[in-house]
């Protein structure tokens, strides 16, 4: 908890049990390797991608169940009265990357969960115009402060609006990550982002 308050992120080993981790990993692998639509037809809500094999899903019901079940734990780590926003799961494959970015308001407090696959570091950084860096976000220099290799079942709780994060192109076969997003229920600025504008968790997005 102290680490989160100081650094705006905290790495937690074994936040999911091996049984839950294995179930979720195999569920999303099966979904990605069959003729089912991994994105459930909602791929346009996360922007346009050139990679024809992009597999990402907003509010998959397994992800939404994790979103609900993990809420008390994220509240405890953040020491905030949080309410669920939405879940998002990606099955990344060779060559895909997560470009340096800050998150939107619906991702005020988040956890990224490693469900399995190959090791793939996630990087965190802050704006620093005086640093020697070739990483930029909105034309501002970014200084990397840490790079973390997650193990299956582990999670990183982080402030996505305030902490720049990214992953370099994956040079292995695949990696499955689920992102659970929450907002501060006591902060008036974020109340409109409850359930990410949906009626409740589990519903498909309306935008």
Show the residue positions of the predicted features.
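Non-heme Fe(II)/2-oxoglutarate
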Residues: 1-78
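Catalytic phosphate/metal-binding cores of nucleic-acid and nucleotide-processing enzymes, i.e., regions
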Residues: 3-10, 41, 45, 81, ...
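Short, well-ordered beta-strand micro-motif
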Residues: 11-13, 157, 181
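A short coil-to-beta-strand element that immediately follows conserved catalytic motifs
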Residues: 79-88
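Conserved active-site beta-strand element of glycosyltransferases/polysaccharide synthases
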Residues: 91
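Catalytic core of non-heme Fe(II) oxygenases with the double-stranded beta-helix
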Residues: 94-162, 174-178, 185-200
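Short proline/glycine-enriched turn/loop segments at secondary-structure junctions
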Residues: 167-172
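C-terminal helix/juxtamembrane-tail motif
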Residues: 199-207
